[in-house]
Every structure is written in structure tokens, then in C-alpha cells.
Amino acid sequence: MKVIDQFKNKKVLVLGLAKSGESAARLLDKLGAIVTVNDGKPFEDNPAAQSLLEEGIKVITGGHPLELLDEEFALMVKNPGIPYNNPMIEKALAKGIPVLTEVELAYLISEAPIIGITGSNGKTTTTTMIGEVLTAAGQHGLLSGNIGYPASQVAQIASDKDTLVMELSSFQLMGVQEFHPEIAVITNLMPTHIDYHGSFSEYVAAKWNIQNKMTAADFLVLNFNQDLAKDLTSKTEATVIPFSTLEKVDGAYLEDGQLYFRGEVVMAANEIGVPGSHNVENALATIAVAKLRDVDNQTIKETLSAFGGVKHRLQFVDDIKGVKFYNDSKSTNILATQKALSGFDNSKVVLIAGGLDRGNEFDELVPDITGLKKMVILGQSAERVKRAADKAGVAYVEATDIADATRKAYELAIQGDVVLLSPANASWDMYANFEVRGDLFIDTVAELKE
């Protein structure tokens, strides 16, 4: 990693632990900062805080005392999940204390070039695809960021022979200043996380931070299926490389079932190893990045053909007596479920949907669920999802939780059918995150097979 001294002897407050906060605290300590960690979880239930204290780092747990900010901190590094209307952050900003996320730290120390991927849907799959293609081409793509490996941790081991392939959420991108990828990808922009950002325009502004420091020597890969992306083209200094499944563009595009890059066929769409129109978009974004990094077509084709998907993202789980089970727990909004359904014959799909009630109706989903074999509906949003099912003329049953839903879906299916968990809702009404929800689905499928 690069040796930098800008944090040496500076007092830094790390707000919130989890993986990224713990990694940031250790890195800052290594860089000579005087680190204080503040986390809301009580110390006795907080193994990360216990470990940091043993390493000599000051920890304050069990709450977020505002008076802590009366100390003269030069910087706050916040966990990306903590919103900016948190009183600690509001007070820090009022005092003129810069508030960053650990992604900024990763950029500052990284010897490896960075490819950053953000967007509303498809981030993790596209990040993984890019990482696998680059690695197959000998460029060693190191996955990091929102994909589960703290960027500041991976950046410490990356050399200039590697490439940091970094999945970035809007939460993370709100806390960057100098962050400068050589290639950035925005998969799409849809109205999500409005409860965090306050408005769609603020959400887009957070995503757009990915290109703030880019120049004409850098490349910004945008989804020209969206008029919004086309409108944003004039607002960046970077060189824009478009991709589209709807039109021929000066980049990566779909035409007559083939995936092209600037007029050259790379592979057939039906050769991609995972189903769904959204994965065609993800593959096109990957092809654009790969060609910008001089990867040959054969390597791209072989890697994307063998691509098996990502856990919780239209993940094939198992086949029980001819019934296939797919875990798409990551589909926490309507668009993601629409794209998941596009890869299947509705008449053979039993869809499990429902979750956290954010107050939105599901009318947009009606055309996509029309013709489904059956639905199994659960969660806080069940009444709203049932209204959409009624409009679509789809029969449904209700379930109490994911295990119950999985069993009922299997009872409704016959050989040749698909049981698809694609909730179109966040998980927080019942489960800590979409991973827990997806894991319970996987576990129940395993029990059904016994």
C-alpha cells in the first residue's frame, strides 16, 4: 500500500463498526492516527470493539454521546449505513469536521488502479463478472467494497499489478472527496433508498459522486437504456462509453441476439451463464470494461459463459424432483423482480414476494406477474402485493415467514416448474438483511430435499 502521512498524529473518530468501520479503524491506527471508535452496540456484545481495545485503540460503546464531538477531531470516518441526519454526523458537520467513508481511505492508499461500480440494481453481479473476466485475462481483479470485503482492507494488500474492482453504494459514495477510479460503471438509476437520501435527485447526486474527479483520460460506462443516463453524459469530464440492449451505441450493445462492442461480435446473448434480461445488461457493462482493459473476446466469452451468478442474486439453489429453486433475495425493489421474472416462463413460476412495507403500491409489477402459476405472499407489504396479484389475476396463498413460504411454494409446483424467491421488498420487517432471508430459503430447500 502507499505510505501516506496525512493522518499521522491526527485525531480521528470512527463512527459505527461492522466490517468497514473495523477495517478503517485498524488502517488509520497503522497510518499513525489517534483513533477513537464509537459504536452503539454494548461492549459485552461487541467482539469487534473488544478486539480493537485489545490492540490499543480507544473504544466507546453502547451509545453515541454527542459530547464526544467536543474533543478536537480532525476527521470522522462513518459506517456507510449511518444516515447523514444522525445527530453525531450533523454535529460533526456543523463543527466543520470532514465526514468520510472508508472507500476514501482505500483510494488514498491503493497502489492498484480502481474500477468502481455503482447503480440501483446489478452492482454485485457486474462487479463479480468484471473481477472474473479481468482475473481470467491475467489482470487479477480484487473484489472489494459493498460486495462484502472492506475496500480499505483489500487496498492494503493490492499491488500495482492488481486491479481493485470496487462495488460502491450510494451510502459509501456520499463520503468521498478525492476518490478517482480510472473506470466507473453506473449500471442503472432507479428510485431506491429514498428513505435514506430524502429524494431521488439526492440519491442520483450521491451516485454521481463516483465521477467527480474523473478526467477525459478516464472512462464512465453508462446504461443508455435510460434517458437519465443520456442526460447525465453532458455533466461529466470523463469519456462516456455507453451500453444498451435497445439500440446500437458507440460502445457495447445487443443486436439480433449478439453482444457487440463497437461493431465487433463478442458473444451470443444466450451464451451468458445466468438467465434474465438484466444479466444481458450486466454482461454488456462487463464487456465494455473488459475491452477498455484490452481483454480479448475469447476470454470474455469463456468467462461469461461459465459465470454461475452470485449468491442471493438469481442464484440457482437446487432441483427437487424437477422443480428448480432460485434465490433472488437481493431483489429488494420492483425493478429487480421485474428483471428476474424476465428470464422465465411465467406459467411455470411460483413467485415468493413481499417484505418491508415502504408505503408503495406494486402496480408497476402487474404486467410482469400476469400469467404466473401462483404466488406466495408474506411480510408487512402483503396487502399491497395481494392487490397487485388481484389486478394481475394471479392466485396466491399467504405465508408466515420464508420457511413457510418455501414449503408452500414447493407444494404448489410440479415437475418443470420454478420456485423463485424474488421479494421486490427489503427484508427488514422480518430479517436483519437480505442475506439472512436468502440463507433461510436455501436451508429450507435443503430440508425439503432430505
Swiss-Prot record:
Pfam families: Mur_ligase_C, Mur_ligase_M, MurD-like_N
InterPro entries reported in the protein's UniProt record: Mur-like_cat_sf, Mur_ligase_C, Mur_ligase_C_dom_sf, Mur_ligase_cen, MurD
Binding locations of ATP: G119, S120, N121, G122, K123, T124, T125
GO cellular component: cytoplasm
Pathway involvement of the protein, from the record: Cell wall biogenesis; peptidoglycan biosynthesis
Cellular compartment(s): Cytoplasm
Keywords, ordered alphabetically: ATP-binding, Cell cycle, Cell division, Cell shape, Cell wall biogenesis/degradation, Cytoplasm, Ligase, Nucleotide-binding, Peptidoglycan synthesis
Keyword Cell division: yes
EC number(s) reported in the record: 6.3.2.9
GO molecular function, one term: UDP-N-acetylmuramoylalanine-D-glutamate ligase activity
Major place of residence: cytoplasm
GO BP: any one term: cell wall organization
Reaction catalysed by this enzyme: UDP-N-acetyl-alpha-D-muramoyl-L-alanine + D-glutamate + ATP = UDP-N-acetyl-alpha-D-muramoyl-L-alanyl-D-glutamate + ADP + phosphate + H(+)
Disulphide-bridged cysteine pairs: none
Role played: Cell wall formation. Catalyzes the addition of glutamate to the nucleotide precursor UDP-N-acetylmuramoyl-L-alanine (UMA).
Family of this protein: Belongs to the MurCDEF family.
PANTHER family: UDP-N-ACETYLMURAMOYLALANINE--D-GLUTAMATE LIGASE
Protein name in the entry: UDP-N-acetylmuramoylalanine--D-glutamate ligase
Native organism: Streptococcus pneumoniae (strain Hungary19A-6)
Classification lineage: Bacteria, Bacillati, Bacillota, Bacilli, Lactobacillales
The gene coding this protein: murD
